Amino acid sequence: MTSAEQLKKEFQIEGITETSVLRYFETLNAGEFEATAALFAVDGVMRPPFESDIVGRDAIAVYLKQECQNIKAYPNTGIAEALENATIQVQVTGKAQTSWCSVNVLWLFILNEQRQISYTKIKLLASPQELLSLRREK
């Protein structure tokens, strides 16, 4: 069995076959944040909830190491569609779990023609009151 076949067997998201998106969740949940960041284009952008854009693989890796140590993502279903310039938009819904809460999430990915993540936005799907209770104090 090839590693791609093994990945598909172990980590599936209904409607999604893009390896970079599957690997994003696999490496994120394994705490392999350097590997997660390596899935991004050199100038890739991550937009986490309550944060400004984080630009570049190094900055994304630093952010993930600081903020995602105890978070598990449970993607459920997704859809992919071709955009202009050979890019692909992938939307995935699921849950994110911390030690103290679980929240519904929408992950939006834009993949470039090399199938690297050029942009991802993580959007919490919760009521305004739920979101206020989740916001970290700075």
Tell where the protein language model's regions lie, with residue ranges.
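Short glycine/serine/threonine-biased micro-segments
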Residues: 29, 54, 92
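Hydrophobic pocket/interface hotspot
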Residues: 24, 36-37, 44, 56, ...
